[in-house]
Amino acid sequence: MKLYYIGILRPNKPEAVQLASASDLSSYSWFERSTVGQAFTFLAETVIPRTEPGQRQSVEENDYVGHAYLRSDGLGGVIITDQEYPVRVAYTLLNKVLEEYLTKHPKAEWENAKEASSKLAMPELEDYVKRYQDPHQADAIMRVQQELDETKIVLHKTIESVLARGERLDTLVDKSEALSQSSKIFFKQAKKTNSCCILM
C-alpha cells in the first residue's frame, strides 16, 4: 500500500489550479521523479474539473488510483495511491486535509487564484504523506480491525493448542485405562501365584 500524492485544487475549466501539494516519489529513480510528479499533477488537475461539487470519485490509471473530492464550496482535493490502498482511508484523509486547508486559508484567499503561491501553501501535507503511508496506523478503525485480526489469530492458535492438548490428554487417559486393566490382570495373576505358594 502506497500513498503517492496529495493535492488541494481549485476547479477551473479545462484544468484546475493546484493550490498546494505534497508527494512521495522515493520509490522512483531520481531520473523518473520529475516525470512521475508531473503526471500526478496532470491527473489531479484533469480529474477535479470533471468532478461534480459535493461528489467523490475514484479514477484508475494504470497502477494508480486518483481519489477526488470536490466540496460544494469549490475546494477540491486529490489523493493518488496504488490500487491496494483502502478507499475509505483515502477519503477520510481527503476530508481532513480540506477542512484544515479551509481553516488556514479562507475561501477569499484562494477562490480567484490563477496559480499556486507560497502564501497558499500547506506544509503539513508533507507530514500527512509520510504518516498515512501505513493506513493501519493512521486510521483508527483500520487499527482496531488489525488488532482484532491479530487477536483472532492468537485465539485460533490458543484454541488449536488446547485442542491438541485435549487430544493428548484423551490419549493419556486411554493409555491409563489400558494400564489399569493390565495392572488389574497382573495383580490377579500375582495373587494367584502368591496363593499357590502359600498352600504348599
From Swiss-Prot:
Q: Do you know which InterPro entries this protein is assigned to?
A: Longin-like_dom_sf (IPR011012), Longin_dom (IPR010908), R-SNARE_YKT6 (IPR045848), Synaptobrevin-like (IPR001388), V_SNARE_CC (IPR042855)
Q: Signal peptide span per the entry? A: none
Classification via Pfam families: Longin, Synaptobrevin
Q: Name the principal localization, coarsely classed.
A: membrane
Record SMART domains: Longin
Q: Where is the lipid attached (S-farnesyl cysteine)?
A: 197
GO molecular function (one): palmitoyltransferase activity
Looking at the UniProt entry, the stretches that span the membrane are none
Q: Which residues carry this modification: Cysteine methyl ester?
A: 197
- Give the UniProt family note: Belongs to the synaptobrevin family.
Protein name per UniProt: Synaptobrevin homolog YKT6
From which source organism is this entry? Yarrowia lipolytica (strain CLIB 122 / E 150)
Gene field? YKT6
